[in-house]
Amino acid sequence: MTHEEHHAAKTLGIGKAIAVLTSGGDAQGMNAAVRAVVRVGIFTGARVFFVHEGYQGLVDGGDHIREATWESVSMMLQLGGTVIGSARCKDFREREGRLRAAHNLVKLGITNLCVIGGDGSLTGADTFRSEWSDLLSDLQKAGKITAEEATKSNYLNIVGLVGSIDNDFCGTDMTIGTDSALHRIIEIVDAITTTAQSHQRTFVLEVMGRHCGYLALVTSLSCGADWVFIPECPPDDDWEDHLCRRLSETRTRGSRLNIIIVAEGAIDRNGKPITSESIKDLVVKRLGYDTRVTVLGHVQRGGTPSAFDRILGSRMGVEAVMALLEATPDTPACVVSLSGNQAVRLPLMECVQVTKDVTKAMAERKFDEAMKLRGRSFMNNWEVYKLLAHIRPPVSKSGSHTVAVMNVGAPAAGMNAAVRSTVRIGLIQGNRVLVVHDGFEGLAKGRIEEAGWSYVGGWTGQGGSKLGTKRTLPRKSFEQISANITKFNIQGLIIVGGFEAYTGGLELMEGRKQYDELCIPFVVIPATVSNNVPGSDFSVGADTALNTICMTCDRIKQSAAGTKRRVFIIETMGGYCGYLATMAGLAAGADAAYIFEEPFTIRDLQVNVEHLVQKMKTTVKRGLVLRNEKCNENYSTDFIFNLYSEEGKGIFDSRKNVLGHMQQGGSPTPFDRNFATKMGAKAMNWMSGKIKESYRNGRIFANTPDSGCVLGMRKRALVFQPVTELKEQTDFEHRIPKEQWWLKLRPILKILAKYEIDLDTSEHAHLEHISRKRSGEAPA
């Protein structure tokens, strides 16, 4: 962005006014969006107004519409719900109510409206916009507004952000609040699992989501449930027999518990509701199992927003302001949404229409169509769930292949989930699956055993690495590794791990020249808290680490708020990769985040100190600074702490905190469980195909570059990339990819922390159309 363009961003909002409101059911992360809209609005020079109590506040006006300041959105990020209040509003549905709302906006000169809510709230906003000119002429006729006021406010711009825990809005992969709701559900499922195992019970859990089965589906994937009932795909007519057979099979395999997940809108093929109680009665009557029902209810809306929702809310809020300020009378009202990890703008009414089409398809019992309309992400979740839950492994192993799975590098939450799904999908395909303990070292020493179906039972929710993981690379022990590949007849290798898994893969490729035994297909599933594996935008375990850092920062900020005038300097992990520091900075509302990828000088440190000195003069008397562990060898955490302590004398005092290895622990978040499960399934499917492809003269021989890949999430899809091709994109000295997508989120961090920056202010999304997205551009 040139200096002039940047200057344009900072003056884009001058003379304009934006109102922000939250409507409909509340969702965690709405506050992050409100905070971003307010701060970016102020950054561009616009005036920003809070509308309290949703549309009701818009209709009632007066004290309900208040101007927001920079400080008024401080300490909001970590709060659940919506601070400015929300209400379901009857008045706004009537034209009379909308007339009053228009009057209130015109009087304040507000012509830009940012609505955060579900599909109902967004449809209401669009109606309001289409009637705007008629409403103004009515107000003018009635003498409530002058001709001048009418001309000044001659059109209304609207942008929507989807805040709903149900994730039922078409066109966006994740709505604000969905991830946090999954956190609440998984916390409960984990807690119930322990008591169910003690008593050998069956639990029926009912989750929210109205007519959308997303929460139920992802929960089932994330906890390895025995059965799930979702409205989009009712069970076959003989489901009662099938369910009971499935539950008793699980028990005979040695499981001590059964978990059944029910979406509140679940129905059978005839459209008759399936209730939790009816399922309980069925299980008790047919099988005599001790069965309990737990209806989760409004717990799912509560609690602290997850790191994902805070970042999502913040990114969407920034994009919303840009969309409003760039809008013209001819641009359609748009929704800012997420596709893969990219912000996109979609026409509001197209999204609403598709969302209505789903309801219509379900009412007409066209369930396949409803599934398709939900998008590719939903379909993928369903396919993987069906594979893992409903298909029995074949008894005979004729024509089977032998695949080995291992962990390499440092432990990361979600590794076990990846191993579980790899093992089970492998068994379903009729393969022999071996697990290797302690990484390449174990492969060399022959610490290898065969895994059966129940070997990996209950692994999804367990943190760390149950197979054991080491950073050792294979080169030194090619002899022993080759011998064991022959001894155990290993025909394919799935490596779950971090940067070492990738470099180990490269070494295996080089070793193929000397050792024929190494000519077997292998795939790397990136799993590391640092998120520094080339070929993937995300790695398994990073989301869990991010939430751990966030939780700690929240507690630290609370302590600082109590003591006043205190600045905390926190050191995060990540090696040379600044992903954790940047994303945690965004999610925890840090004043600065120092990273290796963005070199900084003593002058930058000085600017930050001066910035904090200014901040202490406002009502917000605390600071939070994050520092990546290897961002600079001389400006260490101690150095920065000493500098801040000296410069802040008499104005603020400083404290430091090194988070350390707690970032590698904890039980995996729903995102990591789900991501790992899907990656494992995808890797095993690829592996089966590759082995068949490389089968020649009774043995496996794979020596092409595409037989050694990294499986990664790239923008909107899961892709396999040959490790040799990724070599060019890697900075081996610092163990990071040369290009990293999240660096473009850095300016948002700075704007939200009130820095006057000369940088591109936004990742800039262009208006797209939803039909294109449905035809297969959604992420996997």
From Swiss-Prot:
Start and end residues of each stretch annotated as Interdomain linker: 391-401
User: Per UniProt, which keywords does this protein have?
Assistant: Acetylation, Allosteric enzyme, ATP-binding, Cytoplasm, Glycolysis, Glycoprotein, Hydroxylation, Kinase, Magnesium, Metal-binding, Nucleotide-binding, Phosphoprotein, Transferase
Location of N-acetylthreonine modifications: 2
One GO BP on record is: canonical glycolysis
Q: Specify the domain of life of the species encoding this protein.
A: Eukaryota
Q: Give the main location.
A: cytoplasm
Give the residues the record marks as binding substrate. Answer: 164-166, 201, 208-210, 264, 292, 298-301
Q: Which reaction does it catalyse?
A: beta-D-fructose 6-phosphate + ATP = beta-D-fructose 1,6-bisphosphate + ADP + H(+)
| Binding-site list for Mg(2+) | 119
PTM field = GlcNAcylation decreases enzyme activity.
Please state the pathway this protein functions in, per its UniProt record. Carbohydrate degradation; glycolysis; D-glyceraldehyde 3-phosphate and glycerone phosphate from D-glucose: step 3/4
Q: What is its EC number?
A: 2.7.1.11
Give the matching CDD domains: Eukaryotic_PFK
Q: Which residues of the sequence carry a binding annotation for beta-D-fructose 2,6-bisphosphate?
A: 471, 528-532, 566, 573-575, 629, 655, 661-664, 735
Gene Ontology CC entries for this record: 6-phosphofructokinase complex; membrane
Locate the region C-terminal regulatory PFK domain 2: 402-780
| Catalytic residues of the enzyme | 166
Where it sits in the cell: the answer is: Cytoplasm
Q: Give the N6-(2-hydroxyisobutyryl)lysine positions (modified residues).
A: 557
Residue span of region N-terminal catalytic PFK domain 1 = 2-390
**So which residues have sugars stuck on them?**
530
Sites where the protein binds ATP: 25, 88-89, 118-121
For this chain, the family text in UniProt reads: Belongs to the phosphofructokinase type A (PFKA) family. ATP-dependent PFK group I subfamily. Eukaryotic two domain clade 'E' sub-subfamily.
NCBIfam families from the entry? 6PF1K_euk
Subunit composition?
Answer: Homo- and heterotetramers. Phosphofructokinase (PFK) enzyme functions as a tetramer composed of different combinations of 3 types of subunits, called PFKM (M), PFKL (L) and PFKP (P). The composition of the PFK tetramer differs according to the tissue type it is present in. The kinetic and regulatory properties of the tetrameric enzyme are dependent on the subunit composition, hence can vary across tissues. Interacts (via C-terminus) with HK1 (via N-terminal spermatogenic cell-specific region).
Q: What protein name is recorded for this chain?
A: ATP-dependent 6-phosphofructokinase, muscle type
